[in-house]
């Protein structure tokens, strides 16, 4: 049985004072009872604070990105081992903002996922289509192509210690949300595509939904059989809203 996972992606938001207030409030709220696994992904500069702020809590933490290089002369980059030093359990790779704003390719995303696993960090591999691609009815081709980059580089066994996040790009930060049925259709597609190579891994694979998830739509989305949690953006910056989503997950 899959344990639901809810991950808060803070993006480029926060300050030391704001983070402390948010996490203190979040910790208190979580004590009310949440059975889903929960994690937050703050900006790099705040990762070192997470251990002290979250010590003794049920909340894990992770990073929003990493280098595909393991060490070396790469100014401004963050090595996987550095994230491991800071206690990261997860790292987001291939978020649509990284793909669209910074030109990250499918192959680069796959490389990042694999180097994360080398230091026992679980990559959250993001896939999803643009509005234009959806209107052209090529969602299936796009998502399979993105998944295949990982499968071809490392094989299906790499997904034993990975999470997939489906984020329809047209629903991120736009206020638009895929209907539960639209989201479920793509989640089922992802699981069935992996199952072609290994049905056991496919059955255990966590597939999160990310795309304007809020407290008022989380229950419907997370009730779908192949949606195992959420990758939450803006709503993760509000403790009560985030708690509502976590409770809806399990």
UniProtKB/Swiss-Prot annotation:
One of its GO terms (biological process) is glyceraldehyde-3-phosphate biosynthetic process. It is an enzyme of class 5 (isomerase). Substrate binds at residues 9-11, 173, 212, 233-234. The keyword Disulfide bond does not apply. Pathway: Carbohydrate biosynthesis; gluconeogenesis; Carbohydrate degradation; glycolysis; D-glyceraldehyde 3-phosphate from glycerone phosphate: step 1/1. It is found in: Cytoplasm. Keywords: Cytoplasm, Gluconeogenesis, Glycolysis, Isomerase. One of its GO terms (molecular function) is triose-phosphate isomerase activity. GO terms for cellular component: cytosol. The active site is at residues 95, 167. The keyword Cytoplasm applies. Its EC number is 5.3.1.1. It catalyses: D-glyceraldehyde 3-phosphate = dihydroxyacetone phosphate. Homodimer. Belongs to the triosephosphate isomerase family. Involved in the gluconeogenesis. Catalyzes stereospecifically the conversion of dihydroxyacetone phosphate (DHAP) to D-glyceraldehyde-3-phosphate (G3P). This is Triosephosphate isomerase. The lineage of its organism: Bacteria, Pseudomonadati, Pseudomonadota, Gammaproteobacteria, Chromatiales.
